[in-house]
Amino acid sequence: MSHVPTAGTVPYPQTAAVVLAGGLSSRLGQDKARLRLPAQDGHSLLERTRQLALHFVPHCWTSCRSARQRDCEADVLVDFMPGCGPAGGIYTALTRAAGQGFRDILVLPCDLPFLDEITLQRLFLTHATAPPQTLLTAYAAAESGRMEALVGIYAVTALPFFAKALQEGQRAVRDIIPARHQNLIFYTSADSRPFLNLNTPEDLHTVKSLLASCR
């Protein structure tokens, strides 16, 4: 049964979202998804990201590696193929989205404390005017060309590429969608703050310092 709402409820009713929160957070030493940072209204990183996504789309899942990981939270998607990392989470979300009548999914990681509405709005507007063969609209660093594959909009028609990649043991998300099906938005180092993520205690210190300077 389709869960796509009536047009006008949200800006992009044919898109669902998934927040990837299945990582071990081993380098950080604590569950980054549950981390609460100063000057962010007391929300965890996961909840902040979910709320941000729901400004644009009608439904947002949380992708986890096991049911126990998020046993107190709603809208959890447990990976169909455990041990595949973010690629497995995206594959699961694409499968669920296709089954519920959505056209695209917005993919976001849970550990970007500076991700904002402006960045997501640009992503959606660019995707809306992308060439018809586009399966992925994502950001990429202008200096290095490195794609932010976990901040992107994937068409549900990208599902066969993920299925094939996982069957073949391919786990690197940025290598799954061929370049001819990508639509990239390039950003400079001066505009890179929305993509600053949390992996280590040093990253956490940097983020807290930046948040303090913004007060």
List the predicted regions and their residue ranges.
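Nucleotide and nucleotide-moiety/phosphate-recognizing core
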Residues: 3-170, 178-194, 201-214
